[in-house]
Amino acid sequence: MRLRKVKNALLKINQSPYFYSKDKFAKFTKKQLVLELGCGKGTFLIKEAQKNNNFLFIGIEREPTIVLKAINKINKLDFNLENILLLCTDAKQLDDYFQAESVQKIFINFPDPWPKKRHIQRRLTSPDFLKLFWNLLVKNGLIEFKTDNDKLFEYTLTTLQENSQIFEIIHQITDLNNSEFSFQNSITEYEQRFMELEIPIKKLVIKKII
């Protein structure tokens, strides 16, 4: 379904206290940093921020309209979240915003699988992105990756094997909701739909090494 863009969305999100700026980010220097790439409407991000007050959660989205939807969801909560920000940018620009070895964890939930060969480098688990994430993560930092797409999952496994000098797979799960890890799983909007359709969710937990 094509996204219906909101007029002046970028202006509106810039007026929100939840929208990323260097000044706002600087106030959280004592909190450990967690990123979610492709945070959508913010359902997963909100759940994680609720559970982990000692961390700063930053949701990343390219499209201002989607960032605005996430901000609106946060604004409608009946409680305050003081450890969450939204950033409107492309994932390949992350090193413009965050220093090397400053991120504790990166969540990649149901990214676009970019099935065509000519778009392989756009996949968030391509070698170039893995190297970017490795640079941003602290020592022993983690990536948590979830997908419903079998081909993307297999591609990611292959890419990680080819980059085993910088990352190792800690957990490999082929049916998350019927695994021992299901109880601690925060569910995204997409994930809820897949669960209703009984589509298995695949997950990898990946650790930075060296």
UniProtKB/Swiss-Prot annotation:
EC number annotated for this UniProt entry: 2.1.1.33
An example molecular function term from Gene Ontology annotations: tRNA (guanine(46)-N7)-methyltransferase activity
GO biological process, any: RNA (guanine-N7)-methylation
Catalytic activity entry: guanosine(46) in tRNA + S-adenosyl-L-methionine = N(7)-methylguanosine(46) in tRNA + S-adenosyl-L-homocysteine
Binding-site residues for substrate, renumbered to this chain: K116, D148, T188, E189, Y190, E191
GO cellular component, one term: tRNA methyltransferase complex
CDD domains in the cross-refs: AdoMet_MTases
Binding site for S-adenosyl-L-methionine: E36, E61, D90, D112
InterPro entries on file: SAM-dependent_MTases_sf, tRNA_(Gua-N-7)_MeTrfase_Trmb, tRNA_methyltr_TrmB_bact
Active-site positions on this chain: D112
Keywords: Methyltransferase, S-adenosyl-L-methionine, Transferase, tRNA processing
Pathway involvement of the protein, from the record: tRNA modification; N(7)-methylguanine-tRNA biosynthesis
Record's function text: Catalyzes the formation of N(7)-methylguanine at position 46 (m7G46) in tRNA.
Family as reported in the entry's similarity comment: Belongs to the class I-like SAM-binding methyltransferase superfamily. TrmB family.
PANTHER family the UniProt entry points to: 3-DEOXY-D-MANNO-OCTULOSONIC-ACID TRANSFERASE/TRNA GUANINE-N 7 - -METHYLTRANSFERASE (PTHR23417), PENTACOTRIPEPTIDE-REPEAT REGION OF PRORP DOMAIN-CONTAINING PROTEIN (PTHR23417:SF14)
This protein's name: tRNA (guanine-N(7)-)-methyltransferase
Organism in which the protein naturally occurs: Mycoplasma genitalium (strain ATCC 33530 / DSM 19775 / NCTC 10195 / G37)
